[in-house]
């Protein structure tokens, strides 16, 4: 498992398919896969969970191999793309939970350090997403606003 504030990656995780071709045993057409992605998104699953469900339950190794589109591209075409990217939202949820913990345990210094590292990462990601046009330029992170939303 990697550390949150280091630039190295962890060693655990599933191995991506070796070939970039559609497996011969796959019985789903690109339209079927897109329909499944949209259906799962409407049921409230995040893009990463959609990929896991398609891999584990439907045997679809990679959506991009089959459809030539990423899951978020399919969701964007159908108007289902989340306003805030999934990785940023996960960090915001983590920061909200740490703040909630610190309200009950104000002397927990390791939690304070964790909050500092998490919020630093949030600010770096927001800067990146503004630069690439994913988030609007007037987007700001305020812990109070997101504490109510989550």
Swiss-Prot record:
The keyword Transcription regulation does not apply. SMART domains: Ribosomal_S13_N (SM01386), Ribosomal_S15 (SM01387). Residues 1-21 are annotated as: Disordered. SUPFAM superfamilies: S15/NS1 RNA-binding domain. Keywords: Ribonucleoprotein, Ribosomal protein. GO terms for biological process: translation. One of its GO terms (molecular function) is small ribosomal subunit rRNA binding. PANTHER family: RIBOSOMAL PROTEIN S15P/S13E, SMALL RIBOSOMAL SUBUNIT PROTEIN US15. Part of the 30S ribosomal subunit. This is Small ribosomal subunit protein uS15. It comes from Caldivirga maquilingensis (strain ATCC 700844 / DSM 13496 / JCM 10307 / IC-167). The lineage of its organism: Archaea, Thermoproteota, Thermoprotei, Thermoproteales, Thermoproteaceae.
